[in-house]
Amino acid sequence: VIIVDSVPDSAMLPLSTPPDSVCLLRLSAIGDTCHVVPLLRSLQRAWPQTRFSWVIGKAEARLMTLLPEIEFITVDKRAGLRGLRELRRTLGDRRFDLLLHLQLSIRASAVAAVIRARCKLGFDRARARELQWLFTDARIEPKTREHVLDSFMGFAAACGVEDRRLVWDLPLPEPARERARGLIPEDRGRAARTMVISACSSHALRNWRAERYAAVARHAIERHGMRVILAGGPARIEREMAEAIRRDCPSAIDQVGQDTLPELLALLQRATVLLAPDTGPAHMATMVGTPVIGLYAATNPARSGPYLSRQWCIDAFPRAAAAFLNSTPERLPWATKIERPGVMDLISVGEVCTRLDELLALPP
């Protein structure tokens, strides 16, 4: 069921025949683009002859261009009107059969306005924040309190696609695999047990303390004989975090700022587990089947946690809701963030170590 405005071509949904061309619009961030991939794979299975294009941010494209047979059209999100003019020149007089508008921001909607399509499908009115509904002429079925990935799969349902299995399947370049094998060598015929720590989120108030990461790293090394690798980007906050962790745990291997996104993905695929807050690498690990111990207090893992590892997440969001907002998650708007100083201190070293012990106790 979808709600359609009175625009003639929007009546094409759900589709009775495959479209010739589909454009997906999701500019950022890394984690959200990871959530788009199962939607794209579902559409590809249903419509093998359809041409797919993806309008995406430049940083995110460095990872997603691993997907074959997709045209990537990059947009410089910082370029403003100049970026929109460049996109208009790139697209020329092209007109897609269908645009999937997957981003709730006025900046993304400005991009959607530049893209010509017979039908522009967006979120239902209740979820279409920042006036997204003004830039679409069809809506997905209204749902409440969904994980972000599930909300994206609602676009496949609106198009009449029934096979919505979760498949990512990003081919990894052999040089990236080889680099990962160098960092995580073989041990008795399989990759050595390794915990990767991606310690920083895009928002500093979602980050755990360096000394707590170091304590868990020491536990992994001393109790389980694991290798510990610190991973992340080259930003100053990530470098400072890595240096602080290594002061308390010198055995941790510092890879922060040294990997491309495909190399990081290959490293995560070879790892035993990832420890991370609400950050893009948590969803990258999910794409390659690596379990994630997610640290969630500022955000709700039911909405934005690693999709296949929510049982391994430390969910301190209810504690945060009580401590900072005198409320419960059920009473708060679904997209609420509790990015307050000290919120991540609600997560203890002991509960993270216990979760790691439980995960490692499972048969390989």
Where are the predicted features?
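Catalytic machinery of carbohydrate-active enzymes
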Residues: V1-P364
